[in-house]
């Protein structure tokens, strides 16, 4: 009798309950129950759904019980420093899965700018991240829970260089994706296989020590009282020793592909990817089919047929729409759910949509911009939009000069000097005029049929830039382009402000998440006017 009066049930970290047992309890839970905490259990309910509350969890299990299909997509993110061979690795994996002949590898100058996307064997949605530090803050757009992360190092680099890279990348994942599933990959082993094996062994030892230290710090008594299970759950889950590969000799490529396959379906000692090749509610897959059909520009009748069949016809399709408004999706989904007689159970079409979208985002199929009310049907377009702002080549004088000349030739600026001045101010001070943004986005705006205001608002929503103030209110600050050192007036402004509250202290840390200070600057800009700013600080009045 007392159990029926419970308002909160906490089974976090209880691995003894199967997903079926949890589902049975949820579907028969007493009316008094208000909160059910399921973190780090065998529950198949996505974390994003759990965060929506008990009603969403119950809806998930009701839909799963009503009708289920097998999930076929897994997001894989390849990250690491620049020039370590990430793009070559993705190319060799693609060739391995298709059985095609090995093609020439990308040249050293053919580096990834921002993010590149590809799909391997029809199910692995690959995100290949550019490795230059200026890109790391942009990558947070694409870091989501439920993905597999390949952290890549170059085994011809020194052990110190490799450990610095691992510390950086694992730190980013710790901050952005608690509990990320990580596979360590070493490349370029063909240069000296014995040396590569020795370096990989040293890096394995370092990684074990790093995890032990992070766990020790996280659960240090008297600091913030975090439970040991919570601390362990937040750290990257590194899967075994580093895999040694060579994209030139192809050594280790097949072993890497097999390891990825084994991890993707692993059930013991725990399932790492709760939904890949597992049953999910059919109705959520139907939402995904609707979005896929919208991406390909299907007619209303074709969309209804696709939703009813729970698949888009296997004809070759070109992407017609990159993103759509949430309102349009809601209207179409409500119509499709009615016309196709979708089994909604006790939920409304809108409630089902709210639960389905985060699941689809976790698969890598879509990206959500909730403030703007936009769903990105083709996340690659957003990567293309970010790329001109993040382009590391603008720091090279010859590339900046060539770009300025191109802008004059295309009549985007009245003359070369004005274009060069705008580019220089962007690279050196992080300030982008509207004219410069329209110029560097010209191809993006045309290719994706998006207007300047929409793209501007999207990047501001994700704190990738924010409006300047004062007499430059039409310009924008791009935080990741801000200079590392404070301007000359910074010290004087700090000293002259008698009303300022000043706190001086030391923080002992070996890692600050990329983009953290820039995001703080973006979040605070509406509180006043920046008198001056740089990458790690500023004066706001």
Q: Can you say where each PLM-predicted feature lies in the sequence?
A:
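Conserved hydrophobic beta-strand positions in leucine-rich repeat
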Residues: 6-12, 34-39
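Short, solvent-exposed loop/turn at the beta-strand->alpha-helix junction
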Residues: 1, 15-20, 42-50
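Membrane-proximal C-terminal cap and juxtamembrane stalk of leucine-rich repeat ectodomains
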Residues: 34-74
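Extended, non-catalytic interaction/assembly segments in eukaryotic proteins
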Residues: 69-73, 77, 83, 87-116, ...
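Inter-repeat linker/turn residues at the boundaries of leucine-rich repeats
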Residues: 4, 15, 28-31
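Short, conserved loop/helix-junction motifs that constitute active-site signature segments
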Residues: 26-30, 145, 174-178
């Amino acid at each position: 009798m007392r159990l029926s009066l419970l308002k909160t049930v906490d089974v976090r970290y209880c691995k003894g309950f199967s997903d079926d047992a949890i589902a049975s309890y949820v579907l028969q839970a007493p009316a008094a129950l208000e909160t059910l905490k399921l973190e780090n259990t065998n529950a198949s309910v996505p974390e994003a759904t759990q965060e929506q509350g008990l009603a969403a969890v119950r809806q998930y299990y009701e839909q799963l019980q009503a009708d289920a299909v097998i999930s076929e997509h897994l997001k894989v993110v390849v990250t690491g420093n620049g020039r370590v061979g990430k793009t070559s690795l993705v190319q060799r994996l693609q060739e391995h899965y298709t059985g095609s002949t090995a093609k020439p590898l990308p040249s050293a100058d053919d580096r990834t700018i921002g993010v590149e996307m590809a799909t391997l064997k029809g199910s692995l949605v690959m995100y290949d991240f550019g490795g230059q530090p200026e890109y790391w803050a942009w990558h947070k757009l694409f870091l989501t829970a439920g993905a597999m992360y390949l952290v890549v190092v170059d085994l011809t680099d020194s052990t110190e260089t490799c450990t610095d890279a691992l510390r950086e990348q694992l730190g980013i994942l710790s901050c952005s994706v608690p509990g990320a599933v990580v596979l360590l990959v070493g490349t370029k082993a063909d240069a000296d296989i014995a040396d590569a094996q020795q370096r990989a062994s040293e890096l394995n030892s370092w990684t074990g020590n790093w995890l032990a230290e992070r766990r020790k710090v996280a659960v240090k008594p008297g600091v913030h009282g975090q439970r040991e299970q919570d601390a362990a759950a937040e750290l990257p889950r590194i899967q075994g020793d580093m895999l040694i590969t060579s994209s030139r000799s192809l050594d280790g490529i097949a072993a890497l592909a097999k390891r990825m396959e084994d991890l993707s379906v692993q059930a013991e000692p725990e399932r790492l990817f709760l939904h890949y090749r597992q049953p999910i509610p059919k109705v959520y897959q139907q939402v995904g089919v609707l979005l896929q059909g919208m991406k390909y520009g299907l007619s209303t009748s074709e969309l209804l047929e696709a939703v009813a069949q729970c698949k888009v016809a296997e004809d070759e399709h070109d992407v017609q729409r990159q993103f759509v408004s949430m309102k349009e999706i809601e209207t179409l989904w409500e119509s499709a759910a009615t016309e196709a007689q979708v089994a909604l159970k006790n939920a409304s079409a809108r409630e089902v949509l709210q639960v389905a979208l985060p699941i689809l985002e976790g698969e890598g199929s879509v990206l959500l911009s909730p403030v703007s009310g936009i769903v990105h049907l083709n996340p690659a377009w957003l990567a293309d939009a970010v790329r001109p702002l993040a382009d590391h080549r603008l720091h090279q004088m010859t590339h900046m000069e060539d770009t300025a000349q191109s802008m004059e030739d295309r009549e985007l600026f009245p003359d070369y000097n004005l274009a060069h001045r705008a580019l220089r101010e962007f690279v050196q001070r992080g300030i982008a005029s509207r004219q410069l943004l329209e110029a560097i986005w010209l191809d993006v705006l045309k290719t994706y049929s998006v207007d300047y205001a929409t793209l501007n608002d999207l990047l501001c929503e994700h704190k990738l830039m924010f409006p300047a103030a004062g007499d430059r209110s039409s310009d924008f600050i791009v935080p990741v382009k801000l200079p590392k050192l404070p301007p000359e007036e910074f010290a004087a402004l700090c000293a002259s402000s008698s009303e300022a509250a000043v706190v001086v202290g030391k923080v002992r840390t070996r890692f600050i998440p990329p983009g953290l200070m820039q995001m703080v600057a973006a979040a605070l800009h509406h509180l006043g006017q920046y008198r001056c700013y740089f990458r790690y600080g500023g004066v706001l009045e």
